[in-house]
Every structure is written in C-alpha cells, then in structure tokens.
Amino acid sequence: MSWIVLLIAGLLEVVWAIGLKYTHGFTRLTPSIITIAAMIVSIAMLSWAMRTLPVGTAYAVWTGIGAVGAAITGILLLGESASPARLLSLGLIVAGIIGLKLSTH
C-alpha cells in the first residue's frame, strides 16, 4: 500500500510542478489554489508512505516520479525539447526508480 500511496504522491508532485508555471508567481487564484492543494496532499502522502518505506528510497522515488513526469509533460504538452540525451537521462532516472523499488524490502 505504501508504494501505491508514494506513486500517487509522485504524480501529484507533477501536478504542482507544472502548476507552478501557471500560477505566475502565485498571482493567479485558480492555478495557485490547485498547485498549493497538490503540494499539501503530495507531501502528506509522501510522509504517510515514509512510515513503512526507508526515507532515502521514498524521497528518491517521489522526486524521480516528479522529475520524469514534469519533463514528459513538458515535452508532450509544452513543446519542450525531446533530445536523445534528455530522453536517455529520463530513462536512467526511471531505471533508478525501478531499482530502488526492487531493492527495498
């Protein structure tokens, strides 16, 4: 169950990371509310997952999901670069996340 909660927390990290772009420095109300809510829930879920998962593993997976998710969202929806080096780097992060999952008891 902790891994599922951590996955959802990571996906919410993507929401708030992308949301930051649309808050315009927290001057736009609706994007700001969505972004802050996603931040709070994401961190609360990360904290809950850390009750049973090692801190280093949980935090690395959470940030990895957020980083990869934000980068992929940027590529697919915001027209950001999808260079081979960038895609390879994202693949390495995913491999690291999988490795952490497989090596955690």
Curated annotation (Swiss-Prot):
Xref: InterPro entries: Small_drug/metabolite_transptr, Small_multidrug_res
Role this protein plays: Guanidinium ion exporter. Couples guanidinium export to the proton motive force, exchanging one guanidinium ion for two protons.
Species per Swiss-Prot/TrEMBL record: Klebsiella oxytoca
UniProtKB keywords: Cell inner membrane, Cell membrane, Ion transport, Membrane, Plasmid, Transmembrane, Transmembrane helix, Transport
Pfam families assigned to the protein according to its UniProt record, in alphabetical order: Multi_Drug_Res (PF00893)
Transmembrane segments: 2-19, 29-48, 55-77, 87-104
Stretches in topological domain Cytoplasmic: 1, 49-54, 105
Entry keyword annotation includes Ion transport: yes
Protein name: Guanidinium exporter
GO biological process, one term: monoatomic ion transport
The family this protein is said to belong to: Belongs to the drug/metabolite transporter (DMT) superfamily. Small multidrug resistance (SMR) (TC 2.A.7.1) family. Gdx/SugE subfamily.
Subcellular location: Cell inner membrane
